[in-house]
Every structure is written in C-alpha cells, then in structure tokens.
Amino acid sequence: MQILDFHCHVYPHAIAEKASDAVARFYQVHRGVEIPDQTAALDDVLQAQAEAGIAKTVLCSAATVPHQVQHINEFLARKAAASGGRCLSFGTLHPDSPDPKGDVEHLLELGLKGVKLHPDMQGFALNDPKAMKLYELVGGRVPFLLHTGDPRFSFSNPEQLIPALLAFPETTFVGAHMGGHTFWKEATKVLAGRYENLYVDISSTFFGVTPEEAVDMVRAYGAERVLFGTDFPMWCPNDEVRKFLALPLTEEERRLIAWDNGAKLLHLGSLACAAGA
C-alpha cells in the first residue's frame, strides 16, 4: 500500500537533537507517555520513513519568531530538493511578521506546497485577526496544516478553527491530530461532517485512543477527509504505520487515508507520478 506521511518535522542538522528534545519535553510533561529518542535532521527522516515503507513525506517546521520565517522557508525548500523526490515541504508564516504578504509570496515562489502553523508554539490563536489575515493572503492557493488542540492553552482549540473555516471556504484546512490533540471526542462533535474545506490528520492520536475509537472518529469525519501522519520525531514511523494498518478499517478506507486524500490535496496523482513531483 502506498503511504504518504502528511505530518513530519525536520530541523537543521546542527540543532536537530536539541530541537527534537525540546519538542518532546513540551509534550511529554503534559502526556506522561514515553517518546522515542529520535532526531529529525533530513537523513533521520529519510531513514525512518524508508524503514516504515513510507513513499512520500510532507516536511514542516514552525517559526517561533517573525524574523525566522523566510530563513526557515528557504531551509524547507532545500530539504525537499535534497530528498531525491521523497519529500515535499510546507512552509511557515508568523502573524506578527512586519511583511506577511511578502512572506506569503516568498513561500509560494519557493515552491512550497502548503503552510504549517503551530499556534501553541508560535503564541497566537487560530481565530486571531492577524492569523485570519494570513489565511486571506494565501487565498486558497495552498492548504494549511494547523496544530489543533491542547487544553493547556487557548490558542488551537477546535472551536477556534471554525471562524476560518467559515470565512475562507476556498481554503483547505487540515486540523492536525484528528482536530483536537488530547480531546478528540470533543473535537469530533464540533468539527466532523460540518465543513467541506476541513480535513484532519491522524498523527499523535494512537497513544490516547483505542483502535475502535480511532475508527469511530475516522468515520465521523469520513475516511475521505482523513490523512495519515506520523508527527515524526514524536513517534516512530514504523510503529505508527503498524498501528494504522491494524485499525479495523476497510481496504478502501485505508487507501484513502494512506495515500489518496493527501495525493489529491498535493496534486500528486499515482506514486509513479509522485516520484518526480
């Protein structure tokens, strides 16, 4: 089965270990679960994805301060180019940038395939007027992958995504972590089946729900609205693929989640075509 990882982090080699550890600590304190000792330099990503049988990967990283935006986007473009066709990259934006329009145009000129935002780490709410301006500036030209859900903060709760979904129907939004990290059932109630421009990814979900609960959520959103993702280096891709394939889904549902939905959003077509994308 073709597998596309729609949610994978990558860091410069010099800081990959430090950055990976910092993110792990950010979540490990909250979740109280064991997180693999992994780093996310490009070589680490490619090795882990190959071991898991993942054919294509979306790389992302977030700018925690505005002046990082263009440098990170150039880095992400280089990593995609250096991956031998195995990776695409989503760029980053920051709502406090002095030139958000310039950042958007630069991101698109680099050939980045989407925008990843992490409100909790970047310090803004999904429905903040400055964030809404970013969605407006992108104008539906590429999709947004948004971290959603964390009860410690009031930045990315599922309800805060709704104004963007309503205001920008031409823009595709992907709510990471099944639309609400650690409070999936609540997210499902307010988001599932309601918005034509909403997808969710299944990353960082298996640790907190049963296989049956995961399937219920998939079917509430519709398998045609769900994307596979590992959230590497948070989790081992091999383990995440194994857990996904073990879910009591139909073969059609697996195929949609593993490849077809993501390929549609990224205009990849079949794996043979995607190899040269």
For each feature predicted by the language model, list its residue ranges.
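Divalent metal-coordination and catalytic microenvironments
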Residues: 7, 49, 57, 76, ...
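Catalytic pocket-lining loop regions of alpha/beta-barrel enzymes
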Residues: 113-114, 124-227, 273-277
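Active-site environment of divalent metal-dependent phosphoester hydrolases
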Residues: 11-14, 64-67, 95-99, 122, ...
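Acidic/glycine-enriched edge-of-secondary-structure segments
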Residues: 24-37, 60, 146-148, 169-175
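Active-site gating/metal-coordination segments in enzymes
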Residues: 55-56, 63-146, 150-152, 194-196, ...
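Mid-to-C-terminal alpha-helical segments outside catalytic/metal-binding sites
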Residues: 1-9, 13-56, 105, 223-227, ...
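Histidine-centered divalent metal-coordination motifs
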Residues: 7-13, 118, 147, 177
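A general structural detector for well-ordered alpha-helical segments in enzyme core domains, enriched
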Residues: 44-48, 72-79, 103-107, 130-134, ...
